[in-house]
Amino acid sequence: MAFKIASSPHVTRNLHTSTVMQRVILCLLPGLVVQCAFFGWGTLVQVLLAILVALSCEAAVMKLRNRNIKASLSDNSAMLTAILIGVAIPPLAPWWMIVMGTAFAIVIVKHLYGGLGHNLFNPAMAAYVLLLVSFPVQMTTWIAPSTVALHSPSLVESLQLIFNIGAHVNMEQFRLGIDGMTMATPLDTLKTDLSMGLTTTESLTKAIFDGSTGVGWFWVNLAYLAGGLVLLKLKAIRWHISTGVLLGLFVASSIGFLLSPDTQASPLMHLFSGATMLAAFFIATDPVTAATSPRGRIIFGALIGVLVYIIRTKGGYPDAFAFAVLLANLCAPFIDYYVRPRTYGHSTS
């Protein structure tokens, strides 16, 4: 009788890629539902359109590469990328933008570098940056949350606006839900007000803010935080990167707020505005484009958090996670090289 000799642990549980992706997608659903509740049906339409484009592009590329189409589609990676792009862009953005961004993410960013497990950059964030740089007006046009808007677009109106059909529906109907409210996000509004000489306290009196956070965005971030905690409980991701992102952003924003409270947003505003929780738990934790060692993951996450604060306060794009994640992706190989775990019985050198 032959015995297989192997080191512990002897009982392991291997999660397939498709299982991990399914868990991530399921944990995204609470945030998606809350986002749709505040910003209308457009978000759901964008997500469904992105999924259709992503699966089509994935199948086409696999066909050209003579690979197994069914296996590639069933790993759910393309679907996850599509959902992340769909929730990141404004809900009423034109249909061709989500098509362009999703196709770019799947064909160029993912498969041009070799496919799943070989891409250097996060596909969803690379697509977001492409759209933001190419079409800044459309990518910064968010409607007012339903709780403060006089009229929120219905499903039919959302479809008409996204696909540009129906002459009686236009974006102007949702531009000013309440007096003085533009179609900018709370982070955009705060940055614009500060550049005009207003203090943080004066800016926060506007109706788009609810105390120290943006209307609707606090609950959206809270929903993504809840989904992220479930994701940690399911062990689909590790805690290092998410903790690093939130700690890096919290420490940097706390220092800035303590030094200049009149010209800086509070740490609570930074943590629960924009895509903070979505990025911390669902984007930055992409194992392909992140650092690999435990210490390296913490450094990687902290780098993202600090970069987000710097870009939000000094740069031109208040919700800076896409740029921060891509810059950290570039640094991941260097972090892995210089922060290598010590092998037992060997020196660190």
Curated annotation (Swiss-Prot):
FMN phosphoryl threonine modified-residue sites: T185
Signal peptide interval: none
Gene, per the UniProt record: rnfD
Keyword Oxidoreductase: no
Primary location: membrane
Annotated membrane topology: Multi-pass membrane protein
Record localization: Cell inner membrane
Protein name: Ion-translocating oxidoreductase complex subunit D
